[in-house]
């Protein structure tokens, strides 16, 4: 006899990105331009802190929210970026994923709604649905992946609890301009909703003029939650370290969810996390910038339209001209050209593919060559 399980989870599907990577793994020699993971090792000075921590037996329970000295460092780090949060308003988390999970667990009641501008990382919808709430999608493609205020207002209902924004964006690489940020602020203030800022790519920006929502709109501090991660800027994806910041009344509730989800982040990684904050990610950023230029030139040569990415390490070109669904296009590319990309439908936007350029230069060049050859056959 099969006993019932959580009906909300039953509606969720495994990650489409992981599904594509699993298919690619079945094809020897396949070049994967699919996973958003830096191809660099974690800087040695960061890793050395873990070795030292283990050597002195730093393997016991830490404070739930992270050691005070680390939270002070995170507070100062955010302050340097113009974001004012005290150490008591910061929680060290098991990656940005847990930060998002704890945030929505603390924030949502059954039947609440969260506005998700698409294309968007599929995790947002999954966490919202798992908390018995509803994801409401705002299509940003007509606005060149910016947020149109009228369209945003049309998504708001009495059940709306929050909007989640990601800038630079996964999968487009686009950054939200001032008009988009201001539109979110006006709607959030008037509707009385939270703004959850997924800022995990904020150190990976290639153009001038980038602004973060919380810095531009400090008047909404009580309604804003900031999610950050060590994974992208310092190549620490496997460490599972992130943090979040919010005003005291909000952080107090999120801290409860964090405590009962994971208790705490890993004790012997905390000194390494503090050290990471002092490491300049510019060398990696410069490599990504050069790869971005090669990707844009290659896509242009292939005749693929793309809204130029200003950050992160993705491009999101249109494939509408080929008359294939994004899923069919990507499966066909793996089977016929041995190159893996992510279908746009994984992010809620059909007719596009996500191309990740956080791979070695050799793999990137070969992958682009294979993609070009594949497109010429369609």
Go through each PLM region and give its residues.
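Short beta-strand to alpha-helix junction loop
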Residues: 65-66
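PLP-dependent class I/II
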Residues: 2-5, 10-11, 23-26, 31, ...
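A short acidic, glycine-rich active-site loop
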Residues: 57-61
């Amino acid at each position: 006899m099969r006993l019932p399980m959580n009906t909300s989870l039953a509606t969720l599907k495994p990650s489409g990105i992981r599904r594509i990577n699993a298919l690619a793994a079945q094809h020897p020699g396949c070049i994967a331009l699919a996973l958003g993971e830096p191809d660099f090792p974690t800087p040695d000075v960061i890793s050395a802190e873990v070795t030292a921590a283990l050597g002195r037996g730093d393997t016991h329970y830490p404070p739930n929210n992270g050691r005070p000295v680390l939270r002070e460092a995170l507070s100062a780090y955010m302050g340097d970026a113009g974001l004012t949060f005290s150490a008591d308003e910061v929680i060290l988390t098991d990656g940005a994923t847990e930060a998002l999970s704890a945030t929505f667990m603390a924030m949502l009641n059954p039947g609440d709604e969260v506005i998700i501008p698409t294309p968007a990382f599929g995790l947002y919808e999954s966490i919202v649905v798992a908390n018995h709430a509803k994801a409401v999608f705002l299509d940003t493609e007509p606005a060149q992946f910016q947020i149109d205020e009228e369209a945003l207002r049309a998504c708001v209902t009495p059940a709306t609890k929050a909007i989640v924004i990601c800038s630079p964006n996964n999968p487009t690489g686009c950054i939200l301009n001032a008009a988009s940020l201001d539109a979110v602020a006006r709607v959030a203030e008037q509707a009385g909703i939270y703004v959850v800022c997924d800022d995990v790519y904020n150190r990976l920006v290639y153009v001038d003029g980038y602004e973060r929502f919380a810095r531009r709109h400090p008047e909404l501090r009580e309604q804003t939650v900031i999610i950050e991660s060590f994974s992208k800027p310092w190549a620490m994806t496997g460490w599972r370290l992130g943090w979040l910041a919010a005003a005291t009344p909000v952080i107090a509730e999120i801290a409860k969810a964090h405590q009962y989800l994971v208790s705490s982040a890993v004790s012997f990684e905390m000194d390494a996390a503090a050290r990471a904050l002092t490491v300049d990610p510019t060398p990696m950023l410069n490599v990504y910038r050069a790869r971005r230029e090669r990707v844009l030139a290659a896509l242009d040569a292939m005749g693929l339209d793309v809204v130029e990415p200003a950050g992160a390490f993705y491009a999101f070109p249109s494939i509408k001209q080929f008359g294939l669904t994004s899923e069919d296009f990507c499966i066909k590319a793996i089977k016929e050209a041995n190159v893996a990309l992510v279908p746009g439908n994984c992010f809620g936007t059909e007719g596009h593919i996500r191309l990740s350029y956080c791979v070695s230069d050799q793999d990137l060049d070969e992958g682009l060559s294979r993609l070009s050859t594949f497109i010429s056959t369609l």
